[in-house]
Structures are given as structure tokens and as C-alpha cells.
């Protein structure tokens, strides 16, 4: 009896598990728990027969003086625990690294395959894995120096072949932060741990079953291969799981109303769905939405990564529509052209929400009247989950913007509130509608109405911050969103702001605007606790990420550079993590 192997866990595997748990805990969702538990179960069940065979046939062994004693099918409990903790650690690292990535954009249709040679890549991968399995089988039959290597290959190879065949698109297409990095980091770490353990004799590979080659002094090549392939298995398993979820949630025509915790059978059916059945238009909508969000709102893109799959999809599509509508109006060459775009958008909403208008009519209108690069944003708007009025109010906010060409439409505080409600409060209301559509809630209709009203107020707060940040930028395009009543109180008017947006008196008004923003924020933030629990954290991140801009502006001596206040990425991440805690 001994504690050497147990001490390996206490020193080297449990501390990373604790640290990764603390790091990821604020982001942990039910689906994450499901994924990790599922993979841990598979890892234990799949490894026990293989490991038991190795021990019984003395391929490797554990001296009595290094283990506590209890075994499961001749496997020391410390080794069984290792199956669990390795899978847990690598899975959590994958979740941390992949969280920012919106993975559905990496799905490809049959048409994409023709351009990307996906089928050829799949076949090459399958051929390599089949070759490795065949060589492993040969090594085992020879019962020589390659026995241990062969046993590793014929055990891991079939699982890798299955996962590759099902999820090769994700394995190849996703960024290295989602694929290579979560394999390399834990593998290098375990190579170091294994080197220390082998030197101390914690476990021993029997002579005659190994090549005797070392990756470096103290690390047998077979052990290096084992840890590499087990981490590849874990990450490929996570990728296959996420591939299934992406298909499940991205294509409602294939899987209407999917469960947030789908059964293994549903996940398998999702993975087996032919890519020829994918909705190419929807994938285009996702890709363009992500591209717009990355360009236009880094704070919201960071916040969007904290939302779960289907809600994140809907929010991205909603943002894409709002962004496209705003750009159509803002980029118009004349006021008359801008009014025409707003009229076309009103017509689009009329067609979408009229029960007697068929879908093809909406599509025809979009193709005839709108630029090509706006089609996906319009046609993929999740209108079936949204009421029409907030969208119409958003367009009314754009109409207020057009009034700047004659005179400022914002004469008073009331005008400023109305404008902010229309261009930002409406977006907050629609976000809440999407949340209540996805997650069940026991709130009464009256309480839901209060939550939506609070969301409207929070939208006003965020718009106030936006206006405070962009005073200089807006002045360059001839717009002053500060109420003329406020300007008169300090001896200014719209013309003086347009000529010199850096006037010290404007800084005082910026401070007043931010004070009002934080008043709206304080009034509305308690209502977040009334939202379904799954959405509370992500909504707080979205709000706090933007309000951090306001806090930056309020700092003594802070100077807005190039017309905008930028919160560094590290600070945005810190705000998100602190908020979720």
C-alpha cells in the first residue's frame, strides 16, 4: 500500500481541475454539464475494458507500494480517477477556449463541399486512421516491441475514425483555438507529469512490449502517444457534440423546437443529417451577422458568447437586421433616399406580419427592392418570435434622425428619452421577447410587462452612453443629440457644438448625460433577476460591457480619442467574468 499515485493527482491533476472550474464556473450552463458528464461516462466505460486487459496481460503494471489498494476490474482506483479527471480537465479547457467562437458559421452545405474539397479531406483522414488501425493490429499480432503501441491504436483508432467521419467539418474548419490548442496544452502538461511519474516508478511499462524509444529522457514514446490520442479523443468528442448542437439549433426546418438538453439519439440523428439538407441561406445569414457584429460592436460580440446556442443565434440575426436597417438609412446619399429606404422597410414589416401574405412575396420584395448584401439580414430576421411594434418603433427612430437635416428633433429631455426608446429601448424589448420565447417562465403577464418596461429603460441607458461617447463623431455628420434645452442652459446651440465638439461646456453636458444614463441603469438593473435564470448572467454581461464605456468616460481627465472611447479587450473580458461571478 502506498500513496505515490494518489499524490500525483493531488499535485498535478486536481489543481488544474480546481483552477479550470473556478475560471469557467461563471459561464457554466446545463448543456456544458451535460457534455462533460456524457464524455466522462463514455471515457470511463470505453477505457476500463482496455486498461483491464493491459494490466491482466502485464503490458503495464503498478507496484504495490505506489497505490492505495482498491481496484475495479484489476484497475487501481487512482487510474480510474485519472480517466475522469483527464476528460474533465481537457473538456473544460476546450469549453474555455471555444466559448467566443460562434460555431454554426463553420457548417458547410453540399455546395460548399465542392469548393472546399471537404469530401476528399474526409477520405484522406479516414484512410490515415484505417491505416493506423491496421498497423496497430499487425503490431498486436506480432506480440513484439510494438505490442503496447498496437493496443493503443486498435483501441483509440476506431473511436477517432467514427468521430472524424461524423464531425470532420468542424475538426478541419474551426479555428485552432477550438481544435489544436485544447489538444496540445493538456498533452504537453501530461507528458511532463508522466515523465516525473515514470522516473519515480509510479507505473511501469513491461519490457518487450515497448520500442524503448523516448520522446525525451524519461518519456516513453508509447506514453506520449497515449496521452496525445486520449486528448484528441476528448476534443474530437466535444467537437462532435458541438457539431450536433449546431445542426440541431441552426436549422428549424430539420429540427423544429429542439430541446435545450437533447437526448443522445437526437444528437446522433443531428450528426447523421446530410449536409445537403442544410439551409444555405440561414448559414449565410449567420456568417454575415457575425461579420457585422465583429466590425460594429465588439462589446456586444463578447457579450453574445455568453448566451446559449439558440438564443445566441436569434440575437445575432436580430442585431444583423437592426444594423442593416440603420446602415441603409445612414448611408443614403440624400434625405429623400433615406426616407425611401424607411418606407421599403415599413413595407417589408407589413408583408412579414400580414397573415395573408405568403413567404415567397416577402422574398420577392427583398430581392427586388434591397441590395444583395442586405438580403440575409432581412430574410433571416426571427420575426415569428418577435412582435411587430418594437420593429416599427425602431424605424420611427430612424425617421427622427432624418429631421436633423432641417432642425434638431431633440429639443428637450423628453425628446431624448423618446428617441432613445425608439432606437435602443426597442432592441432591449426584442431581446427580452426572444428570451421569454425560448425559456419557460412562471411570471404573470403583468410582471412580464414590467420586465419589458425595465428593458426599455435599460436600452435608454445604453443609448445615453452611446450618445455621450459619440458626440464628436456625430458632430462630423451634422448631428447633435444633446437636447437644445440643455445647450441653452450653458450658452451653446447646435451650431457651436458642430463647430467645436471639444468645448469644455460640452464635457459638462456629457457628464450630465452619463449621470442620467446611470440613473436609468440603476432603476432597471434589478429587473434582470426576473428573467429566466439561463439568461440573467448573459444579459448582465451585455449591459455591463456597454456601461463600462460609460464608466471609462466618467473617469477624471479621460479624453475621448478619435471621437470614441475604447475599452481594452482585456478589460471587457474582466468585466464579463466579474459580472458573471
Curated annotation (Swiss-Prot):
One cellular-component annotation, GO: membrane
The organism's place on the tree of life at top rank: Eukaryota
Region feature (Lycopene beta-cyclase): 1-243
EC number: 5.5.1.19, 2.5.1.32
Pathway in which this enzyme or protein is active: Carotenoid biosynthesis; beta-carotene biosynthesis; Carotenoid biosynthesis; phytoene biosynthesis; all-trans-phytoene from geranylgeranyl diphosphate: step 1/1
Reaction equations catalysed: all-trans-lycopene = gamma-carotene; gamma-carotene = all-trans-beta-carotene; 2 (2E,6E,10E)-geranylgeranyl diphosphate = 15-cis-phytoene + 2 diphosphate
Subcellular location, record wording: Membrane
Location of region: Phytoene synthase: 250-581
SUPFAM superfamilies linked to this entry: Terpenoid synthases
Recorded family membership: In the N-terminal section; belongs to the lycopene beta-cyclase family. In the C-terminal section; belongs to the phytoene/squalene synthase family.
Protein name according to UniProt: Bifunctional lycopene cyclase/phytoene synthase
Organism: Leptosphaeria maculans (strain JN3 / isolate v23.1.3 / race Av1-4-5-6-7-8)
Amino acid at each position: 500500500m502506498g500513496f505515490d499515485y494518489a499524490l500525483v493527482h493531488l499535485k498535478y491533476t486536481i489543481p488544474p481541475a480546481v483552477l479550470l472550474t473556478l475560471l469557467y464556473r461563471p459561464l457554466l450552463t446545463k448543456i456544458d454539464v451535460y457534455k462533460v458528464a456524457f464524455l466522462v461516462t463514455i471515457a470511463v466505460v470505453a477505457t476500463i475494458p482496455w486498461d483491464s486487459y493491459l494490466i491482466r496481460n502485464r503490458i503495464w503494471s503498478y507496484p504495490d507500494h505506489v497505490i492505495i489498494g482498491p481496484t475495479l476490474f484489476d484497475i487501481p482506483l487512482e487510474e480510474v480517477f485519472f480517466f475522469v479527471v483527464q476528460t474533465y480537465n481537457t473538456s473544460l479547457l476546450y469549453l474555455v477556449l471555444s466559448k467566443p467562437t460562434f460555431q454554426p458559421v463553420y457548417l458547410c452545405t453540399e455546395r460548399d463541399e465542392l469548393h472546399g474539397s471537404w469530401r476528399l479531406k474526409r477520405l484522406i483522414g479516414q484512410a490515415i486512421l484505417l491505416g493506423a488501425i491496421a498497423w496497430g493490429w499487425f503490431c498486436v499480432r506480432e506480440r513484439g516491441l510494438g505490442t503496447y503501441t498496437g493496443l493503443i491504436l486498435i483501441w483509440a483508432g476506431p473511436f477517432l475514425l467514427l468521430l472524424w467521419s461524423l464531425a470532420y467539418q468542424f475538426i478541419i474548419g474551426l479555428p485552432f483555438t477550438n481544435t489544436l490548442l485544447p489538444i496540445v496544452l493538456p498533452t504537453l502538461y501530461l507528458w511532463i507529469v508522466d515523465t516525473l511519474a515514470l522516473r519515480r516508478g509510479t507505473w511501469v511499462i513491461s519490457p518487450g512490449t515497448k520500442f524503448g524509444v523516448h520522446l525525451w529522457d524519461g518519456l516513453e514514446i508509447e506514453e506520449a502517444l497515449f496521452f496525445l490520442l486520449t486528448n484528441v479523443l476528448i476534443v474530437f468528442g466535444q467537437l462532435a457534440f458541438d457539431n450536433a448542437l449546431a445542426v440541431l439549433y441552426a436549422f428549424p426546418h430539420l429540427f423544429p423546437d429542439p430541446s435545450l438538453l437533447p437526448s443522445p439519439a437526437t444528437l446522433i440523428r443531428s450528426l447523421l443529417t446530410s449536409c445537403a439538407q442544410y439551409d444555405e441561406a440561414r448559414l449565410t445569414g449567420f456568417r454575415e451577422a457575425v461579420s457585422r457584429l465583429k466590425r460594429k460592436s465588439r462589446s456586444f460580440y463578447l457579450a453574445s458568447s455568453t448566451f446559449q446556442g439558440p438564443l445566441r443565434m436569434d440575437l445575432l440575426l436580430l442585431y444583423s437586421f437592426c444594423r442593416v436597417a440603420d446602415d441603409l438609412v445612414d448611408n443614403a446619399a440624400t434625405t429623400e433616399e433615406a426616407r425611401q429606404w424607411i418606407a421599403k422597410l415599413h413595407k417589408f414589416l407589413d408583408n412579414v406580419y400580414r397573415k395573408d401574405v405568403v413567404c415567397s412575396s416577402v422574398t420577392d420584395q427583398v430581392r427586388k427592392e434591397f441590395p444583395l448584401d442586405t438580403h440575409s439580414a432581412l430574410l433571416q430576421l426571427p420575426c415569428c418570435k418577435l412582435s411587430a411594434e418594437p420593429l416599427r418603433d425602431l424605424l420611427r427612430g430612424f425617421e427622427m434622425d432624418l429631421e436633423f437635416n432641417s432642425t434638431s428633433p431633440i429639443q428637450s429631455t423628453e425628446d431624448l428619452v423618446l428617441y432613445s426608446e425608439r432606437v435602443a429601448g426597442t432592441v432591449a424589448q426584442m431581446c427580452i421577447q426572444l428570451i421569454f420565447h425560448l425559456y419557460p417562465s412562471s411570471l404573470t403577464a403583468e410582471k412580464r410587462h414590467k420586465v419589458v418596461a425595465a428593458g426599455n429603460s435599460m436600452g435608454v441607458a445604453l443609448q445615453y452612453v452611446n450618445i455621450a461617447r459619440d458626440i464628436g463623431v456625430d458632430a462630423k455628420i451634422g448631428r447633435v443629440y444633446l437636447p437644445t434645452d440643455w445647450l441653452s442652459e450653458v450658452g451653446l446651440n447646435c451650431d457651436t457644438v458642430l463647430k467645436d465638439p471639444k468645448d469644455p461646456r460640452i464635457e459638462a453636458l456629457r457628464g450630465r448625460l452619463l449621470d442620467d444614463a446611470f440613473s436609468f441603469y440603476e432603476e432597471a438593473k434589478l429587473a434582470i433577476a426576473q428573467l429566466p435564470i439561463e439568461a440573467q448572467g448573459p444579459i448582465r454581461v451585455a449591459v455591463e460591457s456597454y456601461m463600462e464605456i460609460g464608466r471609462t468616460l466618467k473617469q477624471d481627465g479621460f479624453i475621448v480619442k478619435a471621437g470614441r472611447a475604447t475599452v481594452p479587450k482585456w478589460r471587457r473580458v474582466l468585466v464579463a467574468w466579474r459580472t458573471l461571478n
